[in-house]
Design a protein with these regions (language model features):
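Central hydrophobic cores of alpha-helical transmembrane segments
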Residues: 33-46, 134-137
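Detector for outer-membrane/organellar transmembrane beta-barrel domains
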Residues: 42, 59, 66-70
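Structural signature of hydrophobic alpha-helical transmembrane segments
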Residues: 2-17, 64
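Alpha-helical transmembrane segments of helical membrane proteins, especially in multi-pass transport
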Residues: 73-84
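Hydrophobic alpha-helical transmembrane segments and adjacent interfacial helices
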Residues: 1-4, 17-28, 40-56, 108-125, ...
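Membrane-helix interface "capping/anchor" motifs
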Residues: 24-39, 150-153
């Protein structure tokens, strides 16, 4: 029991820090940066678990599917909101998700790069490549943090 608890304690600590950072981003920044960060966090965690040597098993496949769904949902949300000035129709009601003048291209690029890294990890099957993709997700997040910090007024 002690071995398995300490093996996944690092992931729990990282998850706690990620949720806390996402909450701060949700409270302080624009909503598009929250979606950007959500995609980067999901992709980063999937790269982390894949780099820990899980290989291609059921757990890795589920993590990859969930990450692909999150990336697709963020890209679709950005697409729908860009067409209607930041608003999206949900269950017949119009909900303002993003500001009227938001840059959907940043979300598209982030989702595309993270999705390509995910596909490359699954195709190549290398834990070392997934480890480097984890740092790519961190770099994308830091780039987004700088970009959206300069967008604050």
């Amino acid at each position: 029991l002690r071995y398995f608890w300490t093996e996944h304690a690092t992931a729990l600590y990282m998850l706690h820090a990620a949720v806390y950072c996402l909450y701060i981003i949700y409270c302080l920044y624009r909503s598009e940066f929250f979606c950007f960060s959500l995609a980067a966090v999901f992709a980063g965690f999937s790269f982390y678990f894949y780099s820990k040597g899980l290989g291609m098993n059921a757990r890795t496949a589920i993590i990859a599917i969930v990450t692909a769904l999150v990336l697709a949902a963020v890209a679709l949300l950005a697409n729908r909101a860009a067409k209607s000035k930041g608003s999206v129709k949900l269950f017949g009601k119009t909900v303002k998700v993003f500001p009227a003048k938001f840059n959907a291209t940043v979300l598209y690029v982030a989702c595309t790069v993270l999705g390509c890294c995910l596909v490359a990890c699954l195709v190549l099957g290398s834990a070392l490549f997934a480890y480097y993709c984890m740092f790519a997700a961190i770099a994308i997040e830091l780039t987004g943090a700088v970009y959206y910090t300069f967008q604050l007024k």
